[in-house]
Amino acid sequence: MASPSGKGSWTPEAPGFGPRALAPDLVDSVDDAEGLYVAVERCPLCNTTRRRLTCAKCVQSGDFVYFDGRDRERFIDKKERLSQLKNKQEEFQKEVLKAMEGKRLTDQLRWKIMSCKMRIEQLKQTICKGNEEMKKNSEGLLKNKEKNQKLYSRAQRHQEKKEKIQRHNRKLGDLVEKKTSDLREHYDRLACLRRLHILELTSVIFPMDEVKTSGRDPADVSSETDSAMTSSMVSKLAEARRTTYLSGRWVCDDHNGDTSISITGPWISLPNNGDYSAYYNWVEEKKTTQGPDMEHNNPAYTISAALGYATQLVNIVSHILDINLPKKLCNSEFCGENLSKQRLTRAVRKLNANILYLCSSQHVNLDQLQPLHTLRNLMHLVSPHSEHLGRSGPFEVRADLEESMEFVDPGVAGESDVSGDERVSDEETDLGTDWENLPSPRFCDIPSQPVEVSQSQSTQASPPIASSSAGGMISSAAASVTSWFKAYTGHR
């Protein structure tokens, strides 16, 4: 191999052993090439155009060194040494990695231990909180158990109370049913007793009967006296006389002027049609004629006596039935003399209203009632054939029947009284809704025979002595009412 200088022989030194002699063939090749200088040929090793060259064989085998003598170590030796160093580096790296792997594992274990400690601490705190909550829940559970036990005991007591109340309610229901049955029977007995008293009252003291009259129709009389009136006018007057306004309509009344209703005897009666013109005429004649009235059969006396008896009967019946009348009417309202037309009409209207009120309370068939027929309505009320006579309980008055009362002699409403003492307003005698219904006193039986009515007293009155008989009957009726009242207060 040629040396880097190109002249003379050069023996490289092996690393660690000093200079080393060149091989004989390498020396020969170098000697042979000493005189060759190629200007354009480049060195395959350093890629320069220096004149000193190295052969390809030496380059391929790595058998060359620096030509300037800086390092005597061949390339192949360096390569081997580099390989050895790399191997040592790899061994050192493996040892370092092995040593670091233990450290890494130690750090990982330390980190895991620290994480586990933190987690254990958190778990301890969680367990502590859980224990506290469990303790609280246990205390709450105990309280709830005690509360539930109390509620259960209370529910048991309430159940016992409920069963006791149910038994009590059943007993009360049976008692109420029994009391209701007893009350119904009591009402039935009371109705029978009231019915008995009313029938005794109407059969003994205030008997009523229908009396046929033989008088002619005033329309016929007027037709005979007034020749100017035609037959058609007479027939119209007769037809108008036989009609009555009832329940919002005009109805025909066949018994308008043919009959009259008597009370306490056939000599005391009222016209069936409610015509009190005889009383009005007598009052007018009384004003013009001075002196005592010698006519005992005067219709005015019989009308006033019949209305007075009817008033007494209505008041007694309302007392027996325990019903407050809507209109306050005294028994002596018709006993005075010279009653004006307006005052008499107002009193009759109140009497009719009271009678209709009593009829409604006893469920009398309203189709049989007419506002002008005072005694006939009263007969329907106290009739023995009335099924509900003596009943107790609520009732309702028909509005059309009340409205029909307003048409009773409407012309009288516009008239004014001459005397100031006769101006009696309806408010003074009205028993409307302003009156408070006080509870009735303790029920007591009215004696069935409170007054002994002798046959002589019932036969003393005679038709020729009408005025004295009327006064005697009024006094006897008043005495009977007084005796009933004394017997009633005596039982209290």
Curated annotation (Swiss-Prot):
It comes from the Eukaryota. Residues 222-232 have a biased composition (Polar residues). InterPro entries: UV_resistance/autophagy_Atg14 (IPR018791). The modification Phosphothreonine is found at residue 429. Residues 70-180 form a coiled coil. The modification Phosphoserine is found at residues 29, 416. Ubiquitinated via 'Lys-6', 'Lys-11' and 'Lys-63'-linked polyubiquitin chains on multiple lysines by MARCHF7, leading to ATG14 aggregation and loss of interaction with STX17. The coiled-coil domain is required for BECN1- and PIK3C3-binding and for autophagy. The final 80 residues in the C-terminus define a minimum required region for autophagosome binding called BATS. Forms homooligomers; homo-oligomerization is essential for the roles in membrane tethering and enhancement of SNARE-mediated fusion. Component of the PI3K (PI3KC3/PI3K-III/class III phosphatidylinositol 3-kinase) complex I (PI3KC3-C1) in which the core composed of the catalytic subunit PIK3C3, the regulatory subunit PIK3R4 and BECN1 is associated with ATG14. PI3KC3-C1 displays a V-shaped architecture with PIK3R4 serving as a bridge between PIK3C3 and the ATG14:BECN1 subcomplex. PI3KC3-C1 can associate with further regulatory subunits. Interacts with PIK3CB. Required for both basal and inducible autophagy. Determines the localization of the autophagy-specific PI3-kinase complex. Plays a role in autophagosome formation and MAP1LC3/LC3 conjugation to phosphatidylethanolamine. Promotes BECN1 translocation from the trans-Golgi network to autophagosomes. Enhances PIK3C3 activity in a BECN1-dependent manner. Essential for the autophagy-dependent phosphorylation of BECN1. Stimulates the phosphorylation of BECN1, but suppresses the phosphorylation PIK3C3 by AMPK. PANTHER family: BECLIN 1-ASSOCIATED AUTOPHAGY-RELATED KEY REGULATOR. This is Beclin 1-associated autophagy-related key regulator. The gene is Atg14.
